[in-house]
């Protein structure tokens, strides 16, 4: 690991983490459902972002900052797992299953959309 690379990842991670926090607060206020829509939104946006990055094939420095840092700080499926378990243990197994299926479908669709967008911009 080189210090300049670590700094790029750390700065990107700070940006992504703050953005994720803001999105989570906004989604919590806006949503009246029991679903963790903030996590869905973060996962979908993160998947679109990584699809765009793959399509654009950025330089190593941009990839370290934007993909590893920003997107790594912005979205993680660990929150998805914890929220699914919380729904299940709260006696809401239907919502838990909906969260699992919805996250996978939205995530894969987001990567496809992002990849197509990234390739279109790069063309």
Which positions does each model-derived feature cover?
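Membrane-interface helix-loop junctions in multi-pass transporters/channels
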Residues: 1-123
């Amino acid at each position: 690991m080189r210090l300049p690379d670590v700094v790029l990842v750390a700065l990107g991670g700070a940006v992504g983490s703050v953005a994720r926090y803001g999105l989570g607060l906004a989604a919590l206020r806006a949503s009246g459902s029991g679903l963790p829509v903030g996590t869905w939104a973060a996962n979908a946006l993160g998947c679109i972002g990584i699809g765009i990055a793959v399509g654009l094939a950025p330089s190593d420095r941009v990839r370290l900052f934007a993909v590893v840092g920003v997107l790594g700080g912005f979205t993680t499926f660990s929150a998805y797992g914890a929220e699914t378990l919380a729904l299940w243990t709260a006696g809401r197994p239907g919502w838990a299953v909906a969260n699992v299926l919805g996250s996978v479908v939205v995530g894969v669709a987001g990567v496809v959309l992002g990849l197509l967008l990234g390739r279109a911009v790069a063309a």
